[in-house]
Amino acid sequence: MQGKMMGAILPGNSTVELREFDIPTPGVGQVLIKTMASTICGSDIRAIYREHVGKGAEGYIPGTIAGHEPCGIIVEEGTHLKRFKKGDRVVVYHISGCGLCHDCRMGYAISCSSSQRAAYGWQRDGGMAPYVLAEEKDLVLLPDELSYLDGAQIACGFGTVYEALEKISVSGNDAVLVVGLGPVGLATLQLAKAMGANLTIGVEVKEDRRLMAKELGLADHVFAPNDETLQYILDLTGGHGVEKAVDCSANEGGRTLAI
């Protein structure tokens, strides 16, 4: 496929720019995806208003097409593909690792320390464009039951949380506390339940998020943070606290409560 497309870049200074790019051609082990949905992450908001604060492996390469939560349909195949083909609906995992190091081979591409590691939307072109070039190894098949928007929302937030919960081995033996019920915190509760947690507890400042966690059945108990919150949790767990705690609040008080 040849031609031009418009893509969004994030130069900071409360600005998003649209620039013209060539539609990329997939090479070995690559596919061209027509973007059907590409959601916005908190890191995108930060980059728009305060520029990307990451350095080194997390640094933003100026002029890179933004969007690390893309989902779409494969419209063109490169060579030597093993699992995917034209017409497949796919989610793009937001980190493209080397595929060879220990972390990559364990499925933890986000922890890849190779110089080849690149995040879509930060160091390589992402999904805020009509088409995105992706490595086949970075793709996850999107089930028919899920929409493209579902897939885009899963790409980063759920993927990051899933790795964390897998590493701490959440199971039916565990009561799980999640502090901070934004999108990532809510995803944490949902995945913890799916992994068998016998009790899920959420702590959140905003009332609407507390209500959402309860109405969706994600948390067995939800509390607002105050001087009594720790005692409430101890009372629920027979005085010994929870087996696993995840802080999604980015707040010192939240981290302290989780610990």
Where are these regions (language model features)?
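Short, well-ordered coil/turn residues at beta-beta hairpins
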Residues: Y93, V246-C248
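N-terminal glycine-rich cofactor-binding segment
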Residues: G7-T25, G42-E76, V91-V92, S111-D125
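NAD(P)H dinucleotide-binding glycine-rich loop of Rossmann-like/cofactor-binding domains
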Residues: A57-I61, H68, C98-V179
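Mid-domain Rossmann-like dinucleotide-binding core that forms the NAD(H)/NADP(H) cofactor-binding site
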Residues: D144-D227, Q231
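Glycine-rich beta-strand-centered segment in the early N-terminal region that forms part
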Residues: D22-S38, V53-H102, D138, P143-E145
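Short SAM/SAH-binding signature in class I
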Residues: H240-V246
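Conserved amphipathic alpha-helix within the SDR
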Residues: T229-G239
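Rossmann-fold NAD(P) dinucleotide-binding segment
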Residues: E252-I259
